[in-house]
Amino acid sequence: MFQKPKGTRDFLPVEMKKRKLIEKKLRNIFDSYNFSEINTPTFESFELLSKKTGEEIRNQLFVFNDHGNREMGLRPEFTSSVARFYINEFKNTPKPVKMYYFGNCFRYENPQAGRYREFWQMGAELIGSNKSISDAEVLNMAIEGLKSINMDFEINIGHLGVLKGVFEKYSLSEEDETLIRRLIDKEDTEGLKQVLLKIEEEKNIEISKKVFEVLTLKGGKEVISKLKEKLTDFEKSLDALNNLDEILELVPHDYVVNFGIARGLDYYTGMVFEIYGKKEGARQVCGGGRYDNLIELFEGEKSPAVGFAYGFDRIILNIDDFEVQDDSIFIIPVKNDIFLLKECLKIAKTLRDFGNPVEIDLMGRKLNKALNYANSKNIKRVIIIGENDIFSGKIPLKNMETGEQVLIDVKDLKNFPC
């Protein structure tokens, strides 16, 4: 018997209903901010996908050669594709360009709870504005999306420019900066201490204290003032702190200021944030930030940008008590008669035209078996139709939960009860 590939999933109808409903609620938030939906190819050139992706993700790419021997890869996330899309389609469009997307991505992960080789991302990118209000708009949209689905979460917000200012003050190489940022992202404290000690010995500097002062300060907005006092000689770090202060003035939500956020992708340049779902033991469900150099890296004009992506599957794990109401209607003809079947089809068509999902018994079951079928599918509303009901113009609607039965006027199906 064939089995699904490792790290992939099949979704049952009840799971898909839940996924589609959550997707719809998140889309509604994006639409309310007037972001426009786009889509990109599932695969792109390997050169594009690997150009500015974190080393760990680069090693997890699904790579193949097409029939023209061109090296391709399945997208591991959307931002690189969206940057390419922007350069191809929108570079001359009035700014800002506000886009959102939803689709599947692929990484050769070690499958475990909340981590799959095929997974879904939903996110947004705002390109063309370097103003603090743009960062705030993206932050607010990410937060309000999760609030719309009643998810319990915590958002941590930081700024890469704070540590960048420390690195520049001590003249660290780009390679050292990248290594330190990756160790921070992996929360490898011992590895970070060793690397910083090695740098101190090679350069005869004392950098460890400042780095850990930045990393260990967490809390509310007051953390920014405290860190300013510790970084008075670090001009670029102070600029970053002032920028973050301005952004947070425009974010009317609860958050934790955390400068230990480094993000696993190499293209972030300014404000960064991560959102953790509380149900799954603080698993990250969303991440994003500012990336002002990425468009230029892909041979476009320098364009400031900010965005984020939801890990859609992890969101699902965090709200498994999310109730999906089944509002479908099941029509049971009491006998397999052409006249009766035609009338059932007419009634079903009218109900569907008014937005109701309707199923007709297609198996010619006896009434008890048809009702058992409705119960097995958790259908709450059943219409049982005989010839007398058609002639009288009133059809019986049975509530499968309460057993209550009422007569509905065939001419008034627009006001069919929920």
UniProtKB/Swiss-Prot annotation:
SUPFAM superfamilies: Class II aaRS ABD-related, Class II aaRS and biotin synthetases. Its main location: cytoplasm. It catalyses: tRNA(His) + L-histidine + ATP = L-histidyl-tRNA(His) + AMP + diphosphate + H(+). This is Histidine--tRNA ligase. Belongs to the class-II aminoacyl-tRNA synthetase family. GO terms for cellular component: cytoplasm. It is found in: Cytoplasm. GO terms for biological process: histidyl-tRNA aminoacylation; L-histidine biosynthetic process. One of its GO terms (molecular function) is ATP binding. The gene is hisS. Keywords: Aminoacyl-tRNA synthetase, ATP-binding, Cytoplasm, Ligase, Nucleotide-binding, Protein biosynthesis. It comes from the Archaea. The lineage of its organism: Archaea, Methanobacteriati, Methanobacteriota, Methanomada group, Methanococci. Its EC number is 6.1.1.21. PROSITE patterns: AA_TRNA_LIGASE_II (PS50862).
